[in-house]
């Protein structure tokens, strides 16, 4: 049975006012069943129930962090599992969504990379994470105004489904997000970066998980990184900027004794010369079985200072949800202290 959420809002069943009602129930009210759509005639609800599946998830579990972040573990209808993270701030509500079950990139410092690749998520399974998280938090899906494609998976290797999901996120009759508040992260798929630049109707932001400025180190920590050299990635980033005019963010996880040497800061600054960019330095978040540890605060500061002295726009990103296994690099289907929650609650 097809999943309703896999459809573009313009292609939803029903017409006119009834279609508008259906979209409002799904994307504003966030209900998880057709039966809950009480202003639709009973016969119409039964017809929709017989033709479409509304809920992409069989079950959901949550792990709550002391800082308010929540890790959501989703069991899909085929039994596979993946995760998303909800991060409330004083001025905004942000969600980090997955685009795959597992990940083929195999970054050595990332727990998801150790899982390997399961399968691509469909557009509805990506969008459904937003709806389910909103239901779990007791808010309207439209209250989540910031979204990052930074969970499990490489979005540019699930290109069509990721772009289809992004179009639903931005659609005014669906979630109506601002393109300036949606960021797609990639390990550096040069062909995908250039392709993204040509998506004129999207305009979402780009973040590249670079993590090292030299080929030897990058291939050590990102085995699949050899598919695209750093030069190829940087060339694609420049092409992207030339087409879109948008700044590019570089993500850089700080690994003690691996990529935190000051000569690497200097080389990174050289790589970024002429590119309007921002560097996010991310202290590595610990997880069981990792061979890496985070750089010291002192070394992170020294690396930061070296970049800043070269005129690089740089910040240190403090991760949320570490105690819940929900921080960057920790997503691996671990669920200490989890509780089962209702999926798709209004």
Swiss-Prot record:
Additional notes on this entry: Reaction proceeds by a ping-pong mechanism involving intermediate methylation of a conserved cysteine residue.
The UniProt record lists the keyword Cytoplasm: yes
InterPro entries membership: Aldolase_TIM, Methyltransferase_A, RlmN_N, RNA_MTrfase_RlmN, rRNA_lsu_MTrfase_RlmN/Cfr, rSAM
Keyword field: 4Fe-4S, Cytoplasm, Disulfide bond, Iron, Iron-sulfur, Metal-binding, Methyltransferase, rRNA processing, S-adenosyl-L-methionine, Transferase, tRNA processing
EC number: 2.1.1.192
Disulfide feature: 96-328
Residues at which [4Fe-4S] cluster binds: 103, 107, 110
Origin: domain of life: Bacteria
Family: Belongs to the radical SAM superfamily. RlmN family.
Name by which UniProt lists this protein: Probable dual-specificity RNA methyltransferase RlmN
Location relative to the cell: Cytoplasm
One cellular component term from this protein's GO annotations in UniProt: cytoplasm
Function: Specifically methylates position 2 of adenine 2503 in 23S rRNA and position 2 of adenine 37 in tRNAs.
Residues that coordinate or bind S-adenosyl-L-methionine: 153-154, 185, 209-211, 285
Pfam families, sorted: Radical_SAM (PF04055), RlmN_N (PF21016)
GO terms, biological process: rRNA base methylation; tRNA methylation
Required cofactor(s): [4Fe-4S] cluster
Reaction catalysis annotation: adenosine(2503) in 23S rRNA + 2 reduced [2Fe-2S]-[ferredoxin] + 2 S-adenosyl-L-methionine = 2-methyladenosine(2503) in 23S rRNA + 5'-deoxyadenosine + L-methionine + 2 oxidized [2Fe-2S]-[ferredoxin] + S-adenosyl-L-homocysteine; adenosine(37) in tRNA + 2 reduced [2Fe-2S]-[ferredoxin] + 2 S-adenosyl-L-methionine = 2-methyladenosine(37) in tRNA + 5'-deoxyadenosine + L-methionine + 2 oxidized [2Fe-2S]-[ferredoxin] + S-adenosyl-L-homocysteine
Active-site residues, as the UniProt record annotates them: 83, 328
Residue stretches making up the Radical SAM core domain: 89-323
Signal peptide boundaries: none
Organism, scientific name: Deinococcus radiodurans (strain ATCC 13939 / DSM 20539 / JCM 16871 / CCUG 27074 / LMG 4051 / NBRC 15346 / NCIMB 9279 / VKM B-1422 / R1)
Co-factor: note: Binds 1 [4Fe-4S] cluster. The cluster is coordinated with 3 cysteines and an exchangeable S-adenosyl-L-methionine.
Molecular function terms, GO-annotated: 4 iron, 4 sulfur cluster binding; metal ion binding; rRNA (adenine(2503)-C2-)-methyltransferase activity; rRNA binding; tRNA (adenine(37)-C2)-methyltransferase activity; tRNA binding
Keyword Transferase assigned: yes
């Amino acid at each position: 049975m097809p999943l309703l959420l896999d459809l573009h809002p313009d292609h939803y069943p029903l017409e006119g006012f009834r279609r508008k009602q259906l979209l409002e129930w799904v994307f504003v009210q966030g209900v998880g069943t057709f039966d809950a759509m009480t202003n639709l005639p009973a016969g119409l609800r039964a017809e929709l129930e017989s033709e479409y599946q509304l809920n992409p998830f069989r079950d959901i579990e949550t792990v709550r962090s002391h800082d308010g972040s929540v890790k959501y573990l989703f069991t899909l209808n085929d039994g596979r599992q993946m995760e998303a993270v909800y991060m409330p701030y004083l001025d905004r509500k942000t969600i980090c969504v997955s685009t795959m079950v597992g990940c083929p990139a195999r970054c050595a410092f990332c727990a998801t990379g150790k899982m390997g690749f399961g399968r691509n998520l469909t557009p509805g399974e990506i969008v459904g994470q937003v709806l389910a998280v909103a239901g779990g938090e007791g808010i309207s899906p439209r209250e989540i105004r910031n979204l990052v494609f930074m969970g499990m998976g490489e979005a540019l290797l699930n290109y069509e489904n990721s772009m289809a999901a992004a179009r639903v996120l931005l659609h005014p009759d669906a979630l109506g997000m601002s393109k300036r508040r949606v960021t797609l992260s990639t390990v550096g798929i040069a062909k995908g970066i250039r392709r993204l630049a040509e998506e004129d109707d999207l305009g979402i932001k780009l973040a590249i998980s670079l993590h090292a400025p030299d080929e030897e180190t990058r291939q050590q920590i990102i085995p699949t990184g050899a598919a695209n050299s750093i030069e190829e990635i940087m060339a694609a980033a420049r092409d992207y900027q030339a087409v879109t005019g948008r700044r590019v963010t570089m993500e850089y996880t700080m690994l003690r004794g691996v990529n935190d040497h000051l000569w690497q800061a200097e080389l990174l600054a050289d790589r970024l010369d002429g590119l309007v960019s921002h560097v996010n330095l991310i202290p590595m978040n610990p997880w069981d079985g990792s061979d890496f540890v985070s750089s010291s605060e002192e070394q992170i500061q020294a690396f930061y200072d070296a970049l800043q002295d070269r005129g690089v726009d740089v910040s240190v990103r403090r991760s949320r949800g570490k105690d819940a296994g929900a921080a960057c690099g920790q997503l691996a289907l671990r669920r200490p202290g989890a509780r089962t929650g209702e999926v798709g609650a209004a």
